[in-house]
């Protein structure tokens, strides 16, 4: 039925109980559809019997890639079992390894816990062959569904995560871990560095996949094993989103972060002014403490978060950038004061607060431009990370 052979990538960690059922269903699918199939199990060194199962019971189309953080002993590979050393743990890095090492042109990613129906793989493949760049097994298109015992907060969590990803894709379920794409599109990816579980969204952004289709599926809650979706993973998703925003919308993302840091500086300023005033300090000292602490706070946050690729290391480098930051802040403050004063004198009916806001906006833009293009100028852009082994 299909022109292209298929590689199925299955990332695992302590999923031994689910693998026989998954392999059985994939085997039936292969026989029924005449599908040329390989299954790559990417295991994060579970030591739960997965290796013994592959060696003794798994069908011949299953290959096991054991990922470890440490180095490997020479000659540790077998015919169907390969060990990969120096690998960070995690679902997303495992998927990237699997996509890189797969043999076939059509690549399918799915979970091992049987929440994704293998019987939908033909629909994904046919949609790819019809011209889609990526096809997602979706819970949220017409015909898609989840088990009835999904609680409100789980549903809300999924919807919020999807809404936060909307600037990158119109797909209804970009969070899905069940999707297919071509090797040729995967190999166009730039700077792959996913965090957490949402590797599909990473590929949509980094492979520039604009033609994304969706096939309805019923998402089944796992019966065996334990869910890996924890609060830690949800926080990792937020970090991942930040990276993607910085990748796709670099200038606007860094400007928004710069503005947020500036807003936090106002809070720091007022806090220290209040504390010093309550301690009985003279007004000039209270005001000075607020200014100095907010400058240091703003610099530290911008150095750490807004311009991470351009920060200098070592005491001398940090002090050099701090001096530049203070200089840029002085230029911005001077512009803010001058413009506000000019507006007040030129338009006497203009409220003072409006003039002040105009000055703040102009000062912030100039301050940001000086910091980005001079103080935190990136001389050597980071090289894209290599994929593969």
Residue ranges and their predicted role:
Residues 1-4, 192-267, 277, 302-330, ...:
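Hydrophobic helical membrane-anchoring modules
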Residues 4-6, 27-40, 60-63:
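Short loop->beta transition adjacent to catalytic acidic/histidine clusters or analogous donor-positioning motifs
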Residues 15-30:
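Short, well-formed alpha-helical segments that are part of the catalytic scaffolds
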Residues 17-21, 46-56, 74-77:
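Acidic helix N-cap motif at the loop->helix transition within catalytic regions
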Residues 43-51, 69-71, 114:
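A conserved acidic beta->alpha catalytic loop
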Residues 72-101, 118-197, 222-227, 232, ...:
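Acceptor/aglycone-binding surface of glycosyltransferases and processive sugar-polymer synthases
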Residues 104, 112-115:
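Short acidic donor-binding/metal-coordinating loop in glycosyltransferase active sites
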Residues 107:
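Short aromatic/hydrophobic "clamp" motif used to bind/position activated sugar donors
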């Amino acid at each position: 039925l299909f022109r292209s052979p298929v590689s199925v990538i299955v990332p695992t960690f302590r999923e031994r109980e689910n693998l026989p059922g998954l392999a059985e269903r994939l085997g039936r699918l292969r026989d029924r559809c005449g599908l040329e199939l390989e299954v790559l199990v990417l295991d994060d060194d579970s030591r739960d019997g997965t290796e013994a199962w592959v060696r003794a019971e798994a069908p011949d189309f299953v290959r096991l890639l054991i990922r470890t953080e440490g180095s490997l002993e020479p000659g540790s590979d077998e015919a169907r079992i390969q060990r990969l050393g120096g690998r960070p743990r995690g679902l997303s890095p495992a998927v990237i390894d699997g996509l890189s090492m797969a043999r076939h042109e059509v690549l399918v990613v799915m979970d091992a816990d049987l929440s994704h129906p293998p019987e939908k793989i033909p629909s994904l493949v046919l949609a790819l062959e019809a011209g889609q760049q990526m096809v997602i097994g979706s819970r949220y298109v017409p015909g898609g569904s989840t088990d009835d015992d999904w609680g409100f907060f789980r549903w809300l969590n999924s919807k919020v995560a999807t809404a936060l990803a909307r600037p990158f894709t119109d797909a209804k379920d970009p969070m899905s871990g069940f999707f297919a794409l071509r090797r040729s599109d995967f190999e166009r990816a730039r700077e792959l560095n996913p965090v957490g579980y949402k590797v599909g969204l990473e590929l949509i952004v980094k492979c520039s996949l604009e033609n994304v289709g969706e096939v309805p599926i019923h998402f089944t809650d796992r019966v065996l094993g334990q869910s890996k979706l924890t609060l830690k993973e949800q926080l990792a998703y937020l970090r991942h989103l930040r990276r993607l925003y910085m990748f796709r919308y670099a200038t606007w993302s860094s400007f928004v972060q710069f503005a947020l840091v500036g807003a936090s500086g106002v809070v720091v300023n007022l806090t220290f002014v209040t504390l010093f005033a309550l301690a009985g300090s003279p007004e000039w000292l209270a005001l000075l403490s607020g200014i100095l602490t907010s400058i240091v706070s703003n610099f530290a946050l911008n150095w750490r978060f807004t311009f991470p690729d351009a920060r200098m290391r070592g005491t001398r480098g940090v002090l050099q950038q701090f001096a530049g930051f203070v200089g840029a802040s002085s230029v911005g403050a001077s512009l803010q004061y001058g413009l506000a004063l000019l507006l007040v004198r030129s338009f006497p009916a203009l409220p003072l607060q409006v003039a002040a806001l105009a000055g703040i906006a102009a000062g912030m833009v100039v301050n940001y431009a000086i910091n980005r293009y001079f103080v935190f100028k990136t001389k050597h852009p980071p090289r894209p990370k290599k994929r593969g082994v």
